[in-house]
């Protein structure tokens, strides 16, 4: 993949299931990967010397990441990523989401990684199958798709430690068709 529209170039191969990717303002590729042992937020860089891929976040507070499902980058360099559920990662994203739809545990979370500070903070918890992320055109609102609750939550992109459906977490769209 080349952001400049040039020739195709294979820049990486990943072990596991690539579940989402997004380019940041610098042209770096951020991706979420799920392996049987857990998830990883990775960054791939490509320049005239070649490609480098690094696992940036693989655990939070000493616990391995669950099943990662989505990534979105902001113009300020911050990287938002979703853990769909705390269900076991060994069978991949589809299996984890199916399990969440049946069990409805609401253990999905959205985090933000700040590359300049090298910190991870929780933005939103209590999501029943976080499956997608998007920033508004003005980059002030983060949208989170919630498969289990069949809705899209909207939160301030700078908010921290919110709960799905709680204070300062609005339902942008609800009653979506689903399971």
Indicate where each model-derived feature is located.
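Asp-box/WD-like beta-propeller blade repeats and closely related beta-sheet repeat scaffolds
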Residues: 35-75, 81-89, 93-98
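Short loop/turn segments immediately following beta-strands, especially the blade-tip
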Residues: 44-49, 155-162
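A short loop-to-beta-strand structural motif that recurs across blades of beta-propeller domains
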Residues: 1, 17, 40-42, 108-111, ...
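A short beta-strand motif characteristic of beta-propeller blades
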Residues: 6-12, 52-61, 119-124, 166-172
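Conserved beta-strand positions in repeat-built beta-propeller and related beta-rich domains
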Residues: 1, 23-24, 29-37, 79-89, ...
């Amino acid at each position: 993949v080349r952001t400049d529209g040039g020739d195709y170039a294979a820049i990486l191969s990943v072990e596991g299931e690539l579940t989402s990717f997004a380019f940041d303002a610098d042209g770096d590729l951020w991706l979420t990967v799920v392996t049987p042992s857990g998830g990883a937020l990775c960054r791939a860089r490509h320049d005239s010397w070649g490609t480098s891929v690094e696992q940036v976040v693989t655990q939070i507070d000493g616990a391995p990441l669950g099943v990662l499902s989505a990534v979105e980058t902001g113009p300020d360099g911050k990287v938002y990523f979703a853990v769909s559920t705390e269900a076991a990662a060994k069978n991949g994203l589809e299996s984890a989401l199916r399990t969440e739809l049946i069990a409805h545990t609401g253990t999905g979370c959205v985090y933000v990684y700040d590359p300049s500070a090298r910190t991870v903070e929780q933005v939103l918890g209590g999501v029943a199958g976080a499956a997608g992320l998007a920033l508004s055109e003005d980059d002030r609102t983060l949208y989170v798709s919630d498969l289990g609750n069949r809705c899209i939550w909207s939160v301030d992109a700078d908010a921290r430690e919110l709960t799905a459906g709680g204070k300062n977490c609005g339902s942008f769209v609800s009653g979506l068709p689903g399971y």
